[in-house]
Design a protein with these regions (language model features):
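Active-site bordering "gate/hinge" segments
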Residues: 1-337, 343-346
Length: 350
């Protein structure tokens, strides 16, 4: 239901660096240089303790969330959080610890805690940092246009939420109630580094509003159905209008009225887009490293095997501008690139 995107069609050059990677971003309490120094201190202390390898990440997030119900303000919440996470390796033993205290003493205690956990953890032959050859060098970190702070106050957010809910309630006389509407504006930034040579980080944002109307049928056995809809984007300027979100949420609730169960049968099924995306999410989870490593996936050893019809291709593209899952590198600092995960129905990669 989001309005058509106005995103540029061409990606920036690989060597182009984001301004948000270099300068402190508006609305944050901590700068990129401060986070770099924080992470470097943690890594240096880990090496002094005798760690084989170590990684650390400093992050900060802040935002505003407002909820309304039946035209009245229900909740206003401002959040601000920070964290330093440390991972220490002693051979193939790994320990993790984190803190929200950025003092020198707290950093040393956190590194010590991670080190002590690693000392008493069983060895895992797969535990370790990626090879240096796989690391994404800093000059390859693309600007993916992920950071768009939204200068909105609580009154403006409440007004948008009320407009969204009002649009739902006005759609039909059968929309008789609401579980509420909400607006959220969130932003964060981080810096990560480890002893195999990776250094990187960026700022990002995510904004949204949503509504959950209730539809009902009058009568002795009055039926009530609820549904919801939302719009979520990196850039608030690309959000669908509150009215459009409200109307569509109402239409979804109305469409549930009079629904009935069908007898058990075998037949073709057409899934709506939201459910279809959920099916894709199940596949992604099944071919993800964690599930495969724990052998908890139904797609173990599925590489090269048919798991979809021949007309299905699935592309993983980490470089979509303003994409919700886009990133110039993965969680361990490894290079990423567009690739076919499924080609012609066959699994091509995990």
């Amino acid at each position: 239901m989001n309005k058509p995107s106005t995103r540029a069609k061409s990606a920036p050059a690989a060597a182009k660096a984001s301004a948000s990677l270099q300068e402190p971003a508006s609305g944050f309490s901590y700068s990129r240089p401060f986070f770099e120094e924080l992470v470097d201190r943690a890594l240096a202390h880990a090496k002094r303790l005798g760690a084989t390898d170590a990684g650390a990440e400093a992050s900060e997030g802040c935002g505003l969330s407002v909820s309304v119900r039946k035209g009245e303000l229900e909740n206003v919440e401002r959040n601000r959080d920070k964290s330093l996470g440390v991972t220490v390796y002693i051979g193939h033993r790994r320990g993790n610890a984190s803190t929200s205290d950025f003092s020198d003493k707290a950093i040393e205690q956190t590194v010590q805690a991670a080190y002590d956990i690693a000392r008493f953890t069983a060895e895992d032959p797969m535990a370790g940092l990626p090879d240096a050859d796989d690391i994404a060098p800093p000059d390859t970190h693309r600007d993916l246009d992920l950071f768009h702070p939204w200068a909105i106050d609580s009154e403006q957010a409440a007004r948008l939420a009320m407009e969204c809910e009002a649009a739902a309630l006005k759609t039909s006389r059968r929309i008789t109630n609401s579980e509420g509407a909400g607006v959220s504006a969130q932003q964060s930034h981080f810096f990560s580094a480890h002893t195999r040579g990776f250094r990187g980080g960026y700022a990002s944002s995510r904004h949204s509003f949503s509504v959950s109307p209730i539809a009902s049928l009058p009568g002795r056995n009055a039926e009530m159905q609820r549904d919801a809809w939302y719009s979520s984007e990196r850039d608030a300027a690309e959000l669908a209008s509150p009215e459009a979100v409200g109307r569509y949420a109402a239409q979804r609730a109305l469409s549930r009225l009079g629904s009935r169960k069908i007898a058990t049968t075998q037949c073709p099924v057409l899934f709506e887009s939201t459910l279809a995306a959920g099916l894709l999410g199940g596949f992604v989870q099944a071919v993800s490293g964690g599930s495969l490593y724990r052998k908890s996936s139904f797609l173990l050893d599925s590489l090269g095997k048919m798991v979809f019809p021949k007309h299905i291709d699935i592309l993983e593209d980490p470089f979509v501008l303003r994409g919700k899952g886009s990133s110039p590198f993965d969680e361990e600092g490894v290079r990423v690139a567009p690739r076919k995960v499924v080609r012609g129905g066959r699994v091509q990669g995990y």
